[in-house]
UniProtKB/Swiss-Prot annotation:
Full protein name: Photosystem II reaction center protein H
Any one GO BP annotation for this protein: protein stabilization
Organism: Synechococcus sp. (strain WH7803)
Entry keyword set: Membrane, Photosynthesis, Photosystem II, Thylakoid, Transmembrane, Transmembrane helix
Protein role: One of the components of the core complex of photosystem II (PSII), required for its stability and/or assembly. PSII is a light-driven water:plastoquinone oxidoreductase that uses light energy to abstract electrons from H(2)O, generating O(2) and a proton gradient subsequently used for ATP formation. It consists of a core antenna complex that captures photons, and an electron transfer chain that converts photonic excitation into a charge separation.
Family: Belongs to the PsbH family.
Compartment(s) where it occurs, according to its Swiss-Prot or TrEMBL record: Cellular thylakoid membrane
Cellular-component GO terms for this entry: photosystem II; plasma membrane-derived thylakoid membrane
Transmembrane segments: 29-49
GO function term, MF aspect, one: phosphate ion binding
Organism lineage: Bacteria, Bacillati, Cyanobacteriota, Cyanophyceae, Synechococcales
Gene: psbH
Amino acid sequence: MAQRTRLGDLLRPLNSEYGKVVPGWGTTPVMGIFMVLFLVFLLVILQLYNQSLILEGINVNWNGAG
């Protein structure tokens, strides 16, 4: 038998929608938008690392903090 805890009682309302499926696409388009934004973020980081994206006046040194 599961033990009841105060934390479990506080979190129970968050789990009240468990098993229910929203008809249609739901929040899938929002997830897609965030995935694309994250991909763009990763591409910018990669380009900064490869120095293929050069920002004027900003020196990027990957040799360490010293």
